[in-house]
Amino acid sequence: MTNKKKVNLYKDLYAENSNYFRNLIPMYRLINSCINFEIKSFLDYGCGKSNLADIFYNMRKIKTYKYDPAINDYSYLDKHIKVDLIANCDVMEHVPEDEVDNIFEEMSNISKNIFFNIYLTRAETILPNGENAHCTIKPIQWWQSKILKHFKYANIVLTSYKNSVCIITWKISYYHRILNFYAFIINSFEHMIWKVFHYKLWK
């Protein structure tokens, strides 16, 4: 994202919420269920304060990278970097519409295999300037059309994340769709248990 004002808003947001952390084990489970090719390197593009790259390293022992322009430690992206897989989770809806194609183009130069998780509704998070964090809200078909301008495939897979869609840029077999379904069921069950536990805890 090249919009410096927008990037600075997210820097301010992270500063205001310094203890924020996002556990993406369920996301890893979804991504892993769809992988039908060898991966030796992974990039979390728009990583925020999540542990997705760390999970990939711990589970697969591969080279991992993090990139997020709003986090100083991860704000540099090597122009020559190439990886086997990119995860782009809860990112594109934060990108201004006039920058979407540029982001897709940049990622397509890094890898042909991208796992997108894109939210389709407004966010609960409000930026320091009063704007909703999700500035580009579009239907699934719009995102697929955009992705297909830069990648060969834009296949929808199951997601357990409410109000979002998962799209992958590689061909997936029926076998891996079954694995994806199992991951979806496990994530949904875990989420149900979590909701019941917290309801009883605070009742």
Q: Which residues make up each language-model segment?
A:
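Class I S-adenosylmethionine-dependent transferase superfamily signal
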Residues: 107
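Conserved N-terminal segment of class I S-adenosyl-L-methionine
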Residues: 1-83, 98-104, 130-142, 151, ...
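A short acidic, helix-capping loop that chelates divalent metal ions and anchors anionic groups
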Residues: 123-130
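Hydrophobic adenine-recognition pocket in adenosine-nucleotide-binding enzymes
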Residues: 91-94
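Surface-exposed, flexible loop/turn segments at secondary-structure boundaries
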Residues: 72, 122-123
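Conserved beta-strand signature within the Rossmann-like core of class I S-adenosyl-L-methionine
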Residues: 111-121
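A conserved beta-strand element that flanks and buttresses the S-adenosyl-L-methionine
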Residues: 87
